[in-house]
UniProtKB/Swiss-Prot annotation:
Gene Ontology cellular-component terms listed: cytosol
Gene behind this protein: galK
NCBIfam families given in the database record: gal_kin, PRK05322.1
Site residues (Transition state stabilizer), renumbered to this chain: 27
Record EC number: 2.7.1.6
Pathways per UniProt: Carbohydrate metabolism; galactose metabolism
Key word Protease present: no
Protein's UniProt name: Galactokinase
EC class of the enzyme, as a word: transferase
Family: Belongs to the GHMP kinase family. GalK subfamily.
Function noted in UniProt: Catalyzes the transfer of the gamma-phosphate of ATP to D-galactose to form alpha-D-galactose-1-phosphate (Gal-1-P).
Lineage: Bacteria, Bacillati, Bacillota, Bacilli, Lactobacillales
GO molecular function: ATP binding; galactokinase activity; magnesium ion binding
Catalytic activity entry: alpha-D-galactose + ATP = alpha-D-galactose 1-phosphate + ADP + H(+)
Length: 388
């Protein structure tokens, strides 16, 4: 969607001109899964599937929201003085949360807004539509109210909204990737220290194909919180002998020597995934920097196997996509991405083989699962921004 279309749609809905237009990307994580809430390393990119916005300031204290993705809900009106979570306010709880925490941080938002939203991230796909919306709202508020914010502070407010307003116990990776994204770069982030490096992403003759299971993944209702609790329990058991706060601090030799402290076989498997995935993510960064895409692909495959057997967050749909992808010509690697339990997988595919790949994987998936997957090419882009 371009800026003139955004402005046109805004005027159709609100009857006045927008002040500015905005874009906030989605994200995929190339490798480093379920490590972000375990103090580990991640390697995400911001992508051109994302959330568009148009907005204007109002003279009163009313917030009016409209989403083209939820047209049937019409314009949702919220008083600026009442930024509490209310179930009937549906998707607008995300912007309300961001505004609430911006105010709590001492920023003055002294009048209402009209905000038009259009997103082309498929709902429930696990490509971070909620984080994309959170960062979009932050950028809108920065621009309309002339607020000077460090981007990292905005990223943290997005996470705070997710955790403390919506009630989802997620890590910081999604908001970080979306807020800090850079053209043609992956972000190597240490979630323990929030130190990060931009890693140039030269895929040569290959593209990242996103494969959507089209099985919705409701993060708050999934086993995500259960996995997180298992990891936290494993840490507390290891603390009997080890001075650690997170699994991300462990190398595999140390973990292997002390894993006997963990009293449950499942918790050992969960912790083993995190420790090894952390090492794979560092190796993947080195492979990218060395231009070793074959090595990078092998690490993607190993990541999926670990998520399937040790972390147990894949399921029939994601496994069918990844396993079928591994068998195709021109594929360097494939894995699930995101929280799992549905959502998306990704594959690194030679660009001349993409059509054959989509046909073969799509056909096999439909045979096994009973309905078709969707495919998108992931184009890497910069972080949340003002368009005009």
């Amino acid at each position: 969607m371009n800026t003139s279309q955004l402005r046109e749609k805004f005027k159709e809905v609100f009857g006045v001109e927008a002040d500015h237009t905005f874009f906030s990307p989605g994200r995929i994580n190339l490798i480093g899964e379920h490590t972000d809430y375990n103090g580990g390393n991640v390697l995400p990119v911001a992508i051109t599937l994302g959330t568009y916005g148009a907005a204007r300031k109002r003279d009163d204290k009313v917030l009016r929201f409209f989403s083209a993705n939820f047209e049937e809900k019409g314009i949702i009106e919220v008083p600026l003085e009442n930024l509490r979570f209310e179930k009937e306010h549906n998707w607008t709880n995300y912007p309300k949360g961001v505004l609430h925490f911006l105010q709590e941080a001492g920023h003055t938002i002294d009048s209402g807004m009209d905000i038009y939203i259009y997103g082309n991230i498929p709902n429930g796909s696990g490509l971070s539509s909620s984080s994309s919306l959170e960062l979009l709202i932050g950028v809108i508020v920065e621009k309309l109210y002339d607020i000077k914010l460090e981007r990292l502070d905005l990223v943290k407010i997005g996470k705070q909204t997710e955790n403390d307003f919506i009630g989802v116990n997620s890590g910081i990776m999604d908001q970080f990737a979306i807020g800090m994204g850079a053209d043609q770069c992956a972000i190597y982030l240490d979630t323990n220290t929030l130190k990060y490096d931009l890693v140039p992403l030269d895929l040569k003759d290959n593209v990242v194909v996103i494969m959507n299971t089209n099985k919705r993944r409701e993060l708050a209702d999934s086993k995500y919180n259960e996995r997180r609790a298992e990891c936290e329990t494993a840490v507390s058991e290891l603390q009997e002998k080890l001075d650690i706060q997170t699994l991300g601090e462990l190398d595999f030799l140390t973990f292997d020597a002390y894993s006997y402290l963990i009293k449950d076989e499942n918790r050992i498997k969960r912790a083993r995934h995190v420790v090894l995935e952390n090492q794979r993510t560092l190796q993947a960064r080195k492979a990218l920097e060395a231009g070793d895409l074959e090595g990078f692909g092998r690490l993607m495959n190993a990541s999926h196997v670990s998520l399937e057997y040790d972390y147990e967050v894949t399921g029939l749909e994601l496994d069918t996509l990844a396993h079928t992808a591994w068998e195709q010509e021109g594929v360097l690697g494939a894995r699930m991405t995101g929280a799992g339990f549905g959502g998306c997988a990704i594959a690194l595919v030679n660009k001349d083989k993409v059509e054959d790949f989509k046909k073969a994987v799509g056909q096999r998936y439909e045979e096994v699962v009973g309905y078709a997957p969707s495919f998108y090419i992931a184009e890497v882009t910069g972080g949340s921004r003002v368009l005009d």
